[in-house]
Every structure is written in C-alpha cells, then in structure tokens.
Amino acid sequence: MLRLSDATYLVRDHDEAITFFVDALGFALREDETNASGRRRVVVGPADGGTGLVLALTDAADAVGNQAAGSVAFFLETDDFAAQHARMTAAGVRFSEEPRHEVYGTVAVFEDLYGMPWDLIQPPALG
C-alpha cells in the first residue's frame, strides 16, 4: 500500500505559516523540531490525519505563493461546506469568489497567506 504522507509547502517564515495554518485553517501542528545543525522541520495538516505539509523555508522569494504557477495546488475537502466557509471567513481567510455548485461539489477558491489559490470543496453526497 502506498499513500502520500507529506508534501512540501514553501514559506518565508515558519511562525507566520504556522499561525495561518493552525489559526485560520484549523490544521494541527504535527511536528516542530530543530535538529542539531539548526534546521527546523515543521509539519502541519488536518487534525484528523491525511497528508501533511512540510513548511520549508526558501530563499527563492518568487516561488513562495506561486508553487503551482497561479493554479490551485491544494484542495481542502469538507463534509460541511457552510460551516467551514463561515469559520474560515471569520478567521480572516479571503475567498476570491462566492461558493458555487458544480457537478463535483460545492466549491469556493480562497487565498493562503501568500496569495496562492486553494479550493474548499464539499463533494456531492453519494447515494
């Protein structure tokens, strides 16, 4: 069995990224360790499991917020779109569009702390 455990997410600052992911998106801080050489490893992800994001510092400032060249790179799936949308909006997350209904579910695009677009999506009920 294979599963994607983590993906790299480029950041300018670990602490500002932790604040966004934990406070605004409701993620858990899964790991925050500094090794003997001084390199810090930070991993955040949904509290109930799934793929984590390794928050990686980079000197390539133009890459931060542009990891997918302006396209949506990450998709947050929820089973209660209205509640998550309201919670995220109250936490200061900026949605760039109103929620819309598509054949693949209810979706709205939001921007992360660096302006990169993400989807919040609730798939249609199966049945």
Regions found by a protein language model. Name each.
Residues 17-22, 88, 115:
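Conserved active-site tyrosine of GNAT-family acetyltransferases
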Residues 11-14, 36:
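Conserved beta-strand-loop-alpha-helix junction that forms the acyl-donor binding cleft
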